[in-house]
């Protein structure tokens, strides 16, 4: 929370910070808040401050001679056709498209209060909305009710540009966003609304229906209503209210999103855990709607209205887990996938058109609060009450990494699409160290100036540093650093997260972590294990590499290592089992890798690149390029004539560490007919002794000694299960050649519970017992109504457990016979998901550290939006801050001094 204190964290606010691309600076002239700013006022009980932005088309692109507002349907048939084209043959789009094409809305809204027939009925409807919401006092009349020109447009109206909308308490403000180049006119908001009876909780602009005069704005309220405000020429704006009588849902609206490229469809989430699909052209039912099942899936049900006439809501999504308050949902960049996070701690990923559940992920503990997609749609990042940032792969259907840096709940996660790059790093190691940052500040500003690309300003920079958007005069990221002058280029994702601890964290996540089979840094015969990025002098002399936290340096990269080290699932899938040559290279050379904020390593194998986990059979050859061996317990099973590849050995004994598996010492003699290092198990006795010593040396290795890390050492299995796992792993050596999954290292507490084993190799083998047997749901686990052949299957999710556990298929089949809608509830049992790809243990997947972690506000942060020239953050006290990117701070001299508070007041205890 915002009042959480940590003696190791400085309490002063940062007005600038340095990253690899340069210095980000706070612009006080581009700060947004209430026009009549007063002193600090607590907003703890009010809804979270949200920020929405939209870019309007220029007046030359729009048609200003029309009298029709954006929210008014222009040609019902066209609207219906557009909706159907956007969503394909979506069940959610088909009835809506038909209604949009055939229904004439003359009595729209709830109770017939709204009409598109004439202006008077619009005014009457607006009065009803104001009565329902306690007045809804608006400045729209003042801003748009002045003198009009020959086109009927107000002369004082701002056309085109960007709009920013934010809520604070019971107020809703809309400003013209001027970016980092111009200051804010706080006294001239485009629109201001004050609601007496309820508080706005979320909002969203419709980009597809935007005109130079504005864009339709959806506003959700704490009492459950949804308001649509459409720009309209004249003194009155068009307003419509959905769920007016609260007959559909009485709980708070937690998230609102327009469907991608749809002018009329939007999705609303409520605190009740339900999702509703609306068409803004259709009225709501005058009575409480009744539903009938439309589609049943594993853990979810989709209902549709029984009404003979098409009315809102069109569909209702119900999830069958307890405490399933939907906190946020997000559509993929392509618009075909939907990611939903809820208070029960689950991430659910759907194919929206077919309403199929593609995959799930479980939080380490607590609920998930926020979600976002990577710009290329390959990864989903979620944040929640476990203080972690979790990265989930769409192609592999598993958690591929976690990030630890926040000390409280993560409020917002967002990708920065403007700093994703292919590059190498030739500068120093900033690693959030301000003493080293100043040394590069002036030189980096010159390198990363706004016109550096156009003027050839990268002469001193690495020739291999080529941004993805070469024609963009923006900042560049250098995430894959190498003091060994590695020529290999990797894609780096820049991720930002803000939290209730008032800090912002920036992460550089490279594909060598997300896709590459992790490779050991130390030699095969070494007895040392690096814990938390520690530096070993002798290892440095042997490898010529120094480990620096939070950034690991890469080693010497040869042509063979580039070939064997780069993850190429497509090549492996095409080659089948003819990868012995590559396997020998991978097994003989422990190629090094570097990430911007992760200190991890393990032994690679060509089998590690051979997974097509969770990709459909029809797309496995293409989607295989994004799939690698899981960091969880994934088995090698044949399903739909696909070979799911094996995992590698990733060990994290204490937060962040680098160890090796005993398969290295075994050479390649694990079977003449199999690939070398086909089976990887736990620690050998040498590394086990080393890790045990390090565990006794204290718990201060982690830079972030939070409750999350402390709880990570606790096992979630019963003592009998631990004992069974220990004896099975110690004495059942016959299964070793059949285990092609990643060997998993349990926490030190579990090593103690496996007691009686004085031989470290036995205890470590027990800790990495048969996690290779996958358990998938039976193909008949889903309900019979409307469910397709893939809606049920968690085989693609590969929710595997150790062999001493009952499979999820058995549990689902046993519990699913009682009720069709709850057939997959057992699949969402948190205890059964722990240790699976959906929820790997804390020491079973790569753990990232932030590139930058700075305290930037007095109150908890609630919003983060990246723009091309800046990024914006919002905090609960109603301030929206603009941070200029390197080379874009034109009025940087106006920023606050370090001793001056950025916002009035202080941290509330």
Curated annotation (Swiss-Prot):
Keywords: Repeat, WD repeat
GO cellular component labels: peptidase complex
GO molecular function: deubiquitinase activator activity
Disruption phenotype: Viable but sterile with reduced lifespan. Severe defects in adult intestinal epithelium; increased number of intestinal stem and progenitor cells in the adult midgut.
WD repeat segments: 248-288, 321-362, 363-402, 470-517, 856-893
Residues in coiled coil: none
Region named Disordered: 58-132, 458-483, 554-628, 661-699, 720-739, 749-775
Biased composition regions of type Low complexity, renumbered to the chain: 80-107, 115-127, 612-628, 673-699
GO BP, one annotated term: negative regulation of ubiquitin-dependent protein catabolic process
Skewed-composition ranges (Polar residues): 555-569, 595-606
InterPro entries for the chain: WD40/YVTN_repeat-like_dom_sf, WD40_repeat_dom_sf, WD40_rpt, WD_repeat_creC_regulators
PANTHER family: AT02583P, WD REPEAT PROTEIN
Quaternary organization: Component of the Usp12-46 deubiquitylase complex consisting of Usp12-46, Wdr20 and Uaf1; regulatory subunit that, together with Uaf1, stabilizes Usp12-46. The Usp12-46 deubiquitylase complex associates with arr/arrow; the interaction leads to deubiquitination and stabilization of arr/arrow.
Protein role: Regulatory component of the Usp12-46 deubiquitylase complex. This complex deubiquitylates the wg/wingless-signaling receptor arr/arrow, which stabilizes the receptor and increases its concentration at the cell surface; this enhances the sensitivity of cells to wg/wingless-signal stimulation. This increases the amplitude and spatial range of the signaling response to the wg/wingless morphogen gradient, facilitating the precise concentration-dependent regulation of its target genes.
Name of protein: WD repeat-containing protein 20 homolog
Lineage: Eukaryota, Metazoa, Ecdysozoa, Arthropoda, Hexapoda
The gene coding this protein: Wdr20
